[in-house]
Amino acid sequence: MTVADRTRLDNFDATRAKAIAEARAEGAPADVATLDKVLAGDLLPLHSYKFDGDWRCRTIKIGGMAPKLVVYGWFKCRFHEDGAGLWLDKTTGSQRTRGLFYDDGETRMIYLGKSHYSYEKPGLYGDDPTRDQVAYAYRVGPKRARIEFPAPQYESLLDIIELERE
């Protein structure tokens, strides 16, 4: 993990709190209600859960820009495991991500990924620092998870990918 990404994670709580406060203060009421739903739910254990398979996913951009809250439509994501560990691929939409998860306690994982456009071949974290992504991932329901990206490279203070198993 790069020093810059370690710093993003070290500042996660403050970044997250500021982004959510901005979104709640200035976001459209329907979008704030969606955000509150996404943030709801107890953090559940990860170790015995099987993420493999197809999920629907959407990105929510929070704070830092105008508007302060943007909720995008649903796309498709896929989790799979191999010898390296658990992977996520966002498989539809113009902006995508691919990355690997690492254990970080009973209820949280660290995601190290790389953003790419639909017309590009997916790469790996570390290939291009301007495309590197770092996040914390949580399971928040029997068929729900979210990945929170503090201080992403562009636009917002916090990005969340909301995931629901299909």
Where are these regions (language model features)?
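A short, polar/proline- and glycine-enriched secondary-structure boundary/capping micro-motif
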Residues: R96-D104, E120-G126, S156-E162
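Mid-length scaffold segments of soluble, non-membrane domains
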Residues: L46-M109
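Short, solvent-exposed aromatic-acidic interface loops
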Residues: T91-R98, K114-Y119, F149-S156
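An anionic, turn-rich surface loop/hairpin at beta-sheet edges
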Residues: G64-F75, I110-Y136
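Amphipathic/hydrophobic helical signal segments and adjacent flexible N-terminal regions
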Residues: M1-K50
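Short C-terminal domain-edge/linker segments immediately following a structured domain
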Residues: A84-K90, Y119, G141-R146, E166
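Edge beta-strand at a domain terminus
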Residues: V32-K37, G126-A137, P142-E166
